[in-house]
């Protein structure tokens, strides 16, 4: 049995979970998220209000999807109650970020500013010209937008310039030694 999959998912007060076949819809104080569970996995609501994720057999695919499905359900419940935030920082002379309406505009050493539009359900907060955060209720969407922003100017291994996650350690390389 999957060690993660067999743990029941607790549903906090104020969160409404609707299960219809393989579809799970979660409504909470921050919004609504929906998820479709893969076919061999079943999800049931227990009497105490928690959710249990079960698999019909011990086939390799069922075992692989068991823990994944339980974690995805737990993530959407956390998303509609607390939400997710990724804090990011920019290092480099002249590199900065500004909020234009709901969107971000980066100056990253290119000849032009780089705009990033806020997709539905994502909010940007700029704390300073070199620090900002990406927030939302969908963990996958927050992580993907953060990764796309980081990809604009990856941290340089020689000088450390670029966009990085807060607290991320960049592996530095030693430059060429002159004669």
Curated annotation (Swiss-Prot):
Q: Which residues cross the membrane?
A: none
Alphabetically, the GO molecular function entries are: rRNA binding; structural constituent of ribosome
- Which PROSITE patterns does the record associate with it? RIBOSOMAL_L6_1
GO aspect biological process, one term: cytoplasmic translation
GO terms for cellular component:
cytosolic large ribosomal subunit
UniProt keywords, alphabetically: Ribonucleoprotein, Ribosomal protein, RNA-binding, rRNA-binding
NCBIfam families attached to this UniProt entry: L6_bact
Per the entry, what this protein does is: This protein binds to the 23S rRNA, and is important in its secondary structure. It is located near the subunit interface in the base of the L7/L12 stalk, and near the tRNA binding site of the peptidyltransferase center.
Can you state the subunit structure given in the record? Part of the 50S ribosomal subunit.
The entry's family comment says: Belongs to the universal ribosomal protein uL6 family.
PANTHER family per the UniProt record, alphabetical: 60S/50S RIBOSOMAL PROTEIN L6/L9, LARGE RIBOSOMAL SUBUNIT PROTEIN UL6M
Name of the protein: Large ribosomal subunit protein uL6
- Give the species: Rhodococcus erythropolis (strain PR4 / NBRC 100887)
Classification from the root reads:
Bacteria, Bacillati, Actinomycetota, Actinomycetes, Mycobacteriales
């Amino acid at each position: 049995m999957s060690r993660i999959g067999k743990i029941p998912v607790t549903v906090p007060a104020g969160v409404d979970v609707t299960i219809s076949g393989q579809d799970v819809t979660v409504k909470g104080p921050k919004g609504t998220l929906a998820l479709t569970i893969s076919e061999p996995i079943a999800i049931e609501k227990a009497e105490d209000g928690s959710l249990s994720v079960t698999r019909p057999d011990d086939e390799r695919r069922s075992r692989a999807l068991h823990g994944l499905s339980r974690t995805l359900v737990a993530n959407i419940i956390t998303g509609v109650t607390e939400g997710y935030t990724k804090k990011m920082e920019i290092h480099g002379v002249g590199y900065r970020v500004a909020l234009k309406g709901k969107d971000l505009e980066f100056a990253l050493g290119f000849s032009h500013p780089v705009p990033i539009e806020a997709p539905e359900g994502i909010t940007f907060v700029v704390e300073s010209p070199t620090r900002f955060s990406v927030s939302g209720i969908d963990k996958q969407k927050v992580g993907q937008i953060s990764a796309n922003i980081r990809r604009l100017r990856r941290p340089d291994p020689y000088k450390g310039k670029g966009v990085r996650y807060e607290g991320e350690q960049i592996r530095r390389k030693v430059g060429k030694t002159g004669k």
